[in-house]
Amino acid sequence: MTSENEAAVSAAVAKLYDTYPFPPEPLIDEPPPGYNWRWHWPSAYSFCTGHAPHSNTIKILDAGCGSGVGTEYLVHLNPDAQVTGIDLSAGTLAVARERCQRSGADRVTFQQLSIYDVGQLEDRFDLINCVGVLHHMPDPIKGIQALATKLAPGGLLHIFVYAALGRWEISLMQQAIAMLQGEHRGDYRDGVQVGRQLFGALPETNRIVKRDKERWALENHQDECFADMYVHPQEVDYTIDTLFELIDASGLEFVGFSNPRYWDLNRLVGKSDDVMARAQTLGTREQYRLIELLDPELTHYEFFLSRPPLPQSDWSRSESLLSAIPSRHACMSGWPSKSFFDYDYQLVKLTDPEYDFLSRCADPGITDADTVAELIADTDFTLDDVRSLQRRQLIVLSPTIPTTP
């Protein structure tokens, strides 16, 4: 794609979001509700490394921040961080500024800037958040490479891009609306009108209609969401193969998907020892491809990349685990209770010993507290029990013995 074409596509994308600022969540005069652990630095870092970060005083870039929904979470969930938000659309940035001002998110600066031009920013960032953006760029590889230059050593890049298999019906409707718009394509209000009329005209039994009602109807009640989904001027949907072409081009290291439950082969073919054995002979990326072929409901990929060195802790050494300081995970809803929602809003039911141990752990973020050895002394709670809590993201461990790069 030529630079002239890239500029034209970028202008069309900016026009869409000037017309329909996105996401359209209401502006409120208080911090946003709940949490997204991917936007909470200690939780994201612990997920990627197995241990707490050495510092929470970091710099965060929200690349393609839109109307600031994610940005205000990044500010409120990370009270020691300085946040920068950039976006192409001036209209959307105006909403983002008002949103953050009203919710008290005051450690943020905004700038109208393309991801392609992110090199104009002076800082390098410990956490870069890029959600729902790269797949709308005319050259996503150029975009991810630009972001990679601004990631600090040991930093994390969190990315969300669309998956082709789970968005098949969306792609068909996008093409149909574009055909019916004809010379009016690029008039996004007309596109929304055409799309609404088309959905109203199709039979109830139509596959596209059924999928929209099952998966998207509540979300697409608002025109901003409908426009973003069905009349966007630029979209790239990925498969595992093309996703890793994007990742490899970044020059960064793939840390992992942030929804590991989906990528567990056992949940799909675990009933057959023979099929599992055959699947396990495949390479890791081939296994990922097999999973998405067998469960094509996935509508997006969400994952972390890093710039080495990124120290890792697996807590297999008893000495390291005994000396570590455990704190409760910050992203839990309903604690204190033996039943609550975890970092991913999945229901957790603790045993009595697990509840007792978790109750005696430090509050989130506290690192000057009792070690694992001190907490399990004179109890029947084992190191394997502690490892289980850590694997389930119910505790965050702060090492006192140096971690391995």
Task: Tell me what each language-model feature is.
Residues 141-153:
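A short glycine-rich, Lys/Arg-flanked "PGG" loop and its adjoining helix->strand segment in the class I
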Residues 119-127:
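A short acidic, Gly/Pro-enriched loop at the edge of an enzyme's catalytic core
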Residues 156-208:
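Conserved class I S-adenosyl-L-methionine
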Residues 268-294, 300, 347-405:
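Long, charge-rich, low-complexity alpha-helical segments
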Residues 104-116:
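Conserved SAM-binding strand-loop segment of SAM-dependent methyltransferases
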Residues 19, 29-58, 73:
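Conserved alpha-helix/loop element of class I SAM-dependent methyltransferases that forms part
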Residues 67-79:
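Conserved SAM-binding loop of SAM-dependent methyltransferases across substrates and taxa
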Residues 89:
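Conserved SAM/SAH-binding beta-strand->alpha-helix loop
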